[in-house]
């Protein structure tokens, strides 16, 4: 035995190195239990979410999502076609508007030309009427002068014959 003058009591070596409170084995046991509990919780959550993912509601949701995606794609395609059609229609409308403007300008020119031609025709008709009147006046004057000449021509002939007869009488 050891001498009695040591100030501490003799302790066994394996007790001396163990920490006070919980031992290392207990910590490992607690850690293992926690790992198992966490594993069980994770497995339960995975099973729950797997069931939820394969449920009818989820399948219907996925099917509806696919239908919505397809419908959206179809609507986008139809919108693109409608926009292209609208653009083409606008271009045709612009072309038609330009054609209408050109035709309107052309019509205004034709109306102006027609009015000028009608004014010229009216002027020429007036001139023709005036010339016809002058022609009628000249015909009337010619008839009058022809009648006068015929009348005066007959009296000239008669007077010429009388002079000739008188000269012949006087001569013989």
UniProtKB/Swiss-Prot annotation:
Propeptide: 153-172
Molecular function GO terms recorded: identical protein binding; metalloendopeptidase inhibitor activity; protein homodimerization activity
Parts forming coiled coils: 103-149
Cytoplasmic side: 1-26
Extracellular side: 48-152
InterPro entries tied to this protein: BST2
Source organism superkingdom: Eukaryota
Gene Ontology cellular component annotations, sorted alphabetically: apical plasma membrane; cell surface; cytoplasm; Golgi apparatus; membrane raft; multivesicular body; plasma membrane; side of membrane
SUPFAM superfamilies per record: Sec2 N-terminal region
UniProt subcellular location: Golgi apparatus, trans-Golgi network; Cell membrane; Late endosome; Membrane raft
Crosslinked positions (Glycyl lysine isopeptide (Lys-Gly) (interchain with G-Cter in ubiquitin)): 20
Glycan-modified residues: 70, 97
Transmembrane segments: 27-47
Record's bilayer topology term: Single-pass type II membrane protein; Lipid-anchor; GPI-anchor
Tissue: Ubiquitously expressed, with highest levels in brain and liver. Present in liver (at protein level).
GO aspect biological process, one term: negative regulation of viral genome replication
Keywords linked to the UniProt accession: Cell membrane, Coiled coil, Cytoplasm, Disulfide bond, Endosome, Glycoprotein, Golgi apparatus, GPI-anchor, Immunity, Innate immunity, Isopeptide bond, Lipoprotein, Membrane, Signal-anchor, Transmembrane, Transmembrane helix, Ubl conjugation
Lipidation (GPI-anchor amidated serine): 152
UniProt modification remark: N-glycosylated.
UniProt subunit comment: Parallel homodimer; disulfide-linked. May form homotetramers under reducing conditions. Isoform 1 and isoform 2 form homodimers and also heterodimers with each other. Dimerization is essential for its antiviral activity. Interacts (via cytoplasmic domain) with ARHGAP44. Interacts with MMP14 (via C-terminal cytoplasmic tail). Interacts with LILRA4/ILT7. Interacts with RNF115.
UniProt-listed PANTHER family: BONE MARROW STROMAL ANTIGEN 2
Entry remark concerning the domains of this protein: The extracellular coiled coil domain forms an extended 170 A long semi-flexible rod-like structure important for virion retention at the cell surface and prevention of virus spreading.
Job description of the protein: IFN-induced antiviral host restriction factor which efficiently blocks the release of diverse mammalian enveloped viruses by directly tethering nascent virions to the membranes of infected cells. Acts as a direct physical tether, holding virions to the cell membrane and linking virions to each other. The tethered virions can be internalized by endocytosis and subsequently degraded or they can remain on the cell surface. In either case, their spread as cell-free virions is restricted.
Protein name (record): Bone marrow stromal antigen 2
């Amino acid at each position: 035995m050891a001498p009695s003058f040591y100030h501490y009591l003799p302790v066994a070596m394996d007790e001396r190195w163990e920490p006070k409170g919980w031992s290392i084995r207990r910590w490992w046991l607690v850690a293992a239990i926690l790992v198992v509990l966490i594993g069980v919780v994770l497995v339960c959550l995975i099973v729950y979410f797997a069931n939820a993912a394969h449920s009818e509601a989820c399948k219907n949701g996925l099917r509806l999502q696919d239908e919505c995606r397809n419908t959206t794609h179809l609507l986008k395609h139809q919108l693109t076609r409608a926009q292209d059609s609208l653009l083409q229609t606008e271009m045709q409308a612009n072309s038609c508007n330009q054609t209408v403007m050109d035709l309107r300008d052309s019509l205004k020119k034709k109306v102006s030309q027609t009015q000028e031609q009608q004014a010229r025709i009216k002027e020429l008709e007036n001139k023709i009427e005036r010339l016809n009147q002058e022609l009628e006046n000249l015909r009337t004057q010619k008839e009058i002068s022809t009648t006068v000449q015929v009348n005066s021509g007959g009296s000239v002939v008669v007077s010429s014959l009388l002079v000739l007869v008188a000269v012949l009488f006087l001569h013989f």
